[in-house]
Amino acid sequence: MSPVQKTGLYYPNKFGLIMIKSLEEVMGKNGLNAILNLGGLNNYIENYPPDNLDKGFDFAELSGIGVALEEMYGPRGGRGLALRAGRATFSDALKNFGALAGAADLAFVVLPLQSKLRIGLPAFAKIFSQLSDQYSTVEEKDTEFIWTIHKCPVCWGRTNADKPVCYIATGLLQEALKWVSGGNEFRVNESKCVAVGDAICEFVIQKEPIS
């Protein structure tokens, strides 16, 4: 596939590095190279993004990975791999940043669960806004939180999808919630997606954990 058309909007290199490494863990070097080829990311074959927070991993490159996973493994298989890559990106790259790093402190650990979510989710959104060109907001409702990505890298440039496709973002959120809550799993459903024609990508997070 021809190289992706760059957007000029970026994630930190480190996010791209961890995502690519997490895929290599699951599918091996040859499988990863096939995905990078298919996604137009040949420049990363044997040449991973540097391990730094410089903004250098283009939104279109992240979207290209998602498209390639679906094309090679089908919607269901691609979804599972993308969720895993998203979870790995949080657990390896993000949990030690800023306010999230304090989630292991005793003062935070003893807070009630809903207080942890009220503090942790906006902190997570703020980190994305600080480290990348992704802008996210959080709104609290009675039984759920609404996480909105206003410039979504995961489905950048995609149209005509028949259902939401931002599984990497869903995985990131699932792992962030697990970390912030001290080990609980939460239901995260993408309810709106730019790839299906919506103006934004929106994720509904149930307040009550499923485990």
Where on the chain are the PLM-derived regions?
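N-terminal low-complexity or simple alpha-helical regulatory segments
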Residues: 2-84, 89-92
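Short terminal or interdomain "cap/linker" segment that borders an active site or interface and mediates
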Residues: 2-18, 129-170, 178-211
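Amphipathic interaction/junction segments at domain boundaries or subunit interfaces
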Residues: 54-165, 178, 192
